[in-house]
Every structure is written in C-alpha cells, then in structure tokens.
C-alpha cells in the first residue's frame, strides 16, 4: 500500500475515533488535530523517509503542522479501543458540565422565585 493511501486511511480512522478533537482549534478544519491535514489527500507518490512524509503532510506553515505532527505521533501507538474510551470520557465530562450548568440555572431561578414569594407574603 502506498504511504499516501496509508495516511489517508489513517486520517479517516483518527477523525472517526477522535470526533470533535479531530477539528483543529486554530483553523477549524476537520482532520488537522488527528495529524492528517487535507494536504495529504493530494499525495500520490509514496514517501521513503519520515522527513518526506512530514513534508507531504505539512507542506505549508499555516497548517500548524509541527503541533499536529507531534499529536499524530503521540496517537500512533494508541489502540482504537483506547481512543474510543477517551472519546467516551470526554463525552461524559461534557454532559456532566452541561448538567451542572443547567442545575445552577435552575437553582438561580428557584432562588429568584423564592425571593418573589417572600416579597408577596410580606405584602399580604
């Protein structure tokens, strides 16, 4: 399999597993944070060295490639199950934070209603 095809498949896999984390915070383009920017789609010649691969994947400075290359390298040996577990943990944390915000808003509304009820009682 040519390296370009390998990286294309790897990119798809990482994007699918990482979900929201596969969107670069700097440029908002899906796929960057998994270490595989869209530039890789244009690669048709297999690269022989890691440096060649790096240049094919990150041909432009504005793609914040160094950061994403390091992230990709750090994820390279992580199993799919581990990535799925991380994704589920992030989803749980997001849901918990959302629930806590709603709970706080409800507490504030209850306190406001309680205050209004006290004022109404004092007028009677």
Swiss-Prot record:
<keyword id="KW-0941">Suppressor of RNA silencing</keyword>
<feature type="coiled-coil region">
    <location>
        <begin position="72"/>
        <end position="124"/>
    </location>
</feature>
<dbReference type="GO" id="GO:0044165">
    <property type="term" value="C:host cell endoplasmic reticulum"/>
</dbReference>
<keyword id="KW-1090">Inhibition of host innate immune response by virus</keyword>
<keyword id="KW-0175">Coiled coil</keyword>
<keyword id="KW-0597">Phosphoprotein</keyword>
<dbReference type="GO" id="GO:0052170">
    <property type="term" value="P:symbiont-mediated suppression of host innate immune response"/>
</dbReference>
<comment type="subunit">
    <text>Homooligomer.</text>
</comment>
<dbReference type="GO" id="GO:0046872">
    <property type="term" value="F:metal ion binding"/>
</dbReference>
<comment type="similarity">
    <text>Belongs to the virgaviridae suppressor of RNA silencing family.</text>
</comment>
<keyword id="KW-0945">Host-virus interaction</keyword>
<keyword id="KW-1038">Host endoplasmic reticulum</keyword>
<dbReference type="Pfam" id="PF04521">
    <property type="entry name" value="Viral_P18"/>
</dbReference>
<dbReference type="InterPro" id="IPR007609">
    <property type="entry name" value="Viral_P18"/>
</dbReference>
<dbReference type="GO" id="GO:0044219">
    <property type="term" value="C:host cell plasmodesma"/>
</dbReference>
<feature type="region of interest" description="C-2">
    <location>
        <begin position="30"/>
        <end position="68"/>
    </location>
</feature>
<feature type="modified residue" description="Phosphoserine">
    <location>
        <position position="79"/>
    </location>
</feature>
<keyword id="KW-0899">Viral immunoevasion</keyword>
<protein>
    <recommendedName>
        <fullName>Suppressor of RNA silencing</fullName>
    </recommendedName>
</protein>
<keyword id="KW-0479">Metal-binding</keyword>
<comment type="function">
    <text>Suppressor of RNA-mediated gene silencing, also known as post-transcriptional gene silencing (PTGS), a mechanism of plant viral defense that limits the accumulation of viral RNAs. Promotes viral cell-to-cell long distance movement.</text>
</comment>
<keyword id="KW-0862">Zinc</keyword>
<keyword id="KW-1031">Host cell junction</keyword>
<feature type="region of interest" description="Basic motif (BM)">
    <location>
        <begin position="1"/>
        <end position="14"/>
    </location>
</feature>
């Amino acid at each position: 399999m040519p390296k370009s095809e390998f990286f294309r498949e790897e990119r798809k896999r990482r994007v699918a597993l990482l979900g929201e984390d596969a969107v670069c915070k700097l440029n908002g383009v899906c796929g960057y944070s998994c270490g595989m920017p869209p530039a890789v789609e244009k690669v048709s010649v297999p690269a022989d060295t890691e440096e060649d691969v790096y240049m094919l994947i990150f041909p432009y400075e504005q793609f914040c490639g160094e950061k994403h290359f390091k992230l990709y390298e750090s994820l390279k040996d992580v199993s799919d199950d581990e990535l799925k577990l991380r994704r589920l943990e992030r989803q749980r944390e997001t849901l918990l934070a959302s629930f806590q915000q709603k709970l706080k808003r409800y507490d504030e509304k209850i306190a406001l209603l309680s205050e209004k009820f006290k004022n109404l009682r004092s007028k009677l």
